[in-house]
């Protein structure tokens, strides 16, 4: 078997810092990331420089952390009111990939840092995301590695817990995951479905893709236009098939307005684009078996 040295987003060359490492969530998830082999080379909390968290050195600024560790990625566990500044600081320090776990970030703040990142060519995952995970390399974020097994299925989702459930079903059926990407449940996010699908399309380790969508917005319809041009098989599943109009379901992005963003319209768009559409979660492993011939 060829050793994989380059996967999508997260690979053997990823060296990450954790912004907000001394907080409860930051500290807890730093330990989890280290346990699965992720290279966490530093942490940042202003005023806490010089400390250690699980053996990881803490710095006062991202600039200082990057200078000392050559970090190229950051995971952000900073509270919502300070998240925008944390992202800007990471971008200005030369970080190339930023995973924003924080939820409840004001939409205008997100728009500002997403636009800034796009202007300078920095990849942002999130906000309000479980992050990314590659069983062979580790994870940036909070995805529980227990649900993942190494394999050739790429996963991309707007939901967190639903991703874990589907990953677990895929594992139980004997299949594994190349990379799992949570794009985030907010109305505005950094990398969208189509960008992640494009990365999977070019990834040698990925043979098939499972895309988990949900009601609200037009992200899945936008993805469907890209799926039309893809060579690799895509299985689509849309959560919220019984959701009433006008009611927000879980995520800020999950709301059906005036007949737009319904599960029905999304499933139709995916089907017309040539994707395999799973009506239930239990259909996903069956469809994978048909596609991958196992």
Curated annotation (Swiss-Prot):
Can you tell me which residues bind CoA?
Answer: 22-25, 48, 101-103
Oligomer and partners: Heterotetramer of two alpha and two beta subunits.
Provide a Gene Ontology MF annotation, just one.
nucleotide binding
Which residues does substrate bind? 164
Which NCBIfam families does this entry report, sorted A to Z? Answer: PRK05678.1, sucCoAalpha
What does UniProt list as catalytic? 251 (tele-phosphohistidine intermediate)
Q: Which family does it belong to?
A: Belongs to the succinate/malate CoA ligase alpha subunit family.
Part of which pathway? Carbohydrate metabolism; tricarboxylic acid cycle; succinate from succinyl-CoA (ligase route): step 1/1
Q: Does the keyword Repeat apply?
A: no
Q: Provide the leader sequence positions.
A: none
Q: Provide GO CC annotations from the record.
A: succinate-CoA ligase complex (ADP-forming)
- Catalyses which reaction? succinate + ATP + CoA = succinyl-CoA + ADP + phosphate; GTP + succinate + CoA = succinyl-CoA + GDP + phosphate
What are its GO biological-process terms?
A: tricarboxylic acid cycle
Q: Which SUPFAM superfamilies match?
A: NAD(P)-binding Rossmann-fold domains, Succinyl-CoA synthetase domains
Protein name listed in UniProt: Succinate--CoA ligase [ADP-forming] subunit alpha
Quote any Pfam family the record assigns. Answer: CoA_binding
């Amino acid at each position: 078997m060829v050793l994989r040295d380059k996967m999508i987003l997260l690979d053997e060359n990823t060296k990450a810092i954790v912004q907000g490492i001394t907080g409860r969530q930051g500290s807890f998830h730093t330990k989890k990331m280290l346990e699965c082999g992720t290279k966490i080379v530093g942490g940042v909390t202003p005023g806490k420089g010089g400390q250690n968290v699980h053996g990881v050195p803490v710095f006062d600024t991202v600039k200082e952390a990057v200078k000392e560790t050559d970090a190229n990625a950051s995971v952000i566990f900073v509270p919502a009111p300070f998240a925008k500044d944390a992202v800007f600081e990471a971008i200005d320090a030369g970080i190339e990939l930023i995973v924003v776990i924080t939820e409840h970030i004001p939409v205008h703040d997100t728009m500002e840092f997403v636009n800034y990142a796009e202007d300078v060519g920095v990849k942002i995952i999130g906000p309000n995301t479980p992050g990314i995970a590659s069983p062979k390399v580790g994870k940036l974020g909070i995805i529980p590695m227990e649900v993942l097994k190494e394999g050739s299925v790429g996963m991309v989702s707007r939901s967190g817990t639903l991703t874990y459930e589907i990953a677990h079903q895929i594992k139980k059926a004997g299949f594994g995951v190349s990379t799992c990407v949570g794009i985030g449940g907010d109305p505005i996010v950094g990398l969208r479905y189509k960008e992640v699908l494009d990365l999977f399309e070019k990834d040698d380790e990925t043979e098939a893709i499972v895309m988990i969508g949900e009601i609200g917005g037009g992200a899945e319809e936008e993805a469907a236009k890209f799926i039309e041009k893809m060579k690799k098989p895509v299985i689509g599943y849309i959560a919220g098939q019984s959701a009433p109009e006008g009611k927000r379901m879980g995520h800020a992005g999950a709301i059906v307005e005036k007949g737009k963003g319904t599960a029905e319209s999304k499933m139709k768009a995916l089907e017309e684009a040539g994707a395999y559409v799973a009506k239930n979660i239990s259909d996903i492993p069956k469809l994978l078996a048909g596609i991958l011939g196992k």
